[in-house]
Amino acid sequence: AAQPNVSKALKNLEEEYGIRIFERSSTGMIPTEQGRHFIEQAERVLREVDRLDADARRRQGECAELRVALPHATYASYAAVDFLQQAAGSEQLQVHIREAGSMEGLDFVLRRGYHLALLRYAEEDEDYYSRYCARRGLHREQIMEFEYRLLVNRDSPLARHEVHDLAELNRYTEVLHDDFQLPGEEGSSLRWQVNENRRVHVYERCSQFSILQSLPTAYMWASPRPQRALEQYHLVLKKFPAQNQRMRDVLVYPDKGGLRPEEEKFIELLRRQAALTVK
């Protein structure tokens, strides 16, 4: 079946370029003078295509490229910085780091060409995200499981004793991000409802540590933090015994049969930083 297709393709070429590539006889086909010239040019073109392809692959190998969507997680930010430090010697560097919620992170991976997204969600939402990712061909890797803690100044009265009742927090000032919502519906009986008259709403995340560092009467609900971040800002994480809401950080990426070296390296660094957090 292949021979007739080849003959037809040759005839189409001859008609398209107005040349005769082969002389046909009962014993076979012999290239004409025009045909030999055409074949030599075609071989040169193919060699050039191979060269361009190899050059493109070489340049791609020299470019450290990574696009990752992350929640507001200090350990993930540290992993991103570690990745940049290791990739700094690359001839080319193309890295996109975007802060995103879980659904937004999924959108960046599925529709916007991002390589990885770290999702953060409550344990009871596991089935939803598992089915969502399975239907869309996304691989999942759990990075961390944790409970929210109280993040306070080391000199705060809250740092010196265990808090057993939310009412104990009413005389302190809560620092919270305007876009941050702890698990549980508005008005639910979960432990997050504290004195609404003593709150600082933060719209610029970098100021949160400065506020806690300078205001011993302030606190915020926080996920695990690297020890060096706590030491740098003179902070401590305190367990709240009545708080048993389990959270998960899960990394997702397209299940395409393998990871690029940059993706493997970032995941390695992310797991390393997760292991160093104070939970």
Predicted regions and their residues:
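Secondary-structure junction motif
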Residues: 77-82, 126, 165-194
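Hydrophobic hinge/microswitch elements
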Residues: 110-115, 179-237
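A short LG(V/I)-centered, amphipathic sequence patch enriched
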Residues: 14-31
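A late-sequence structural motif
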Residues: 236-279
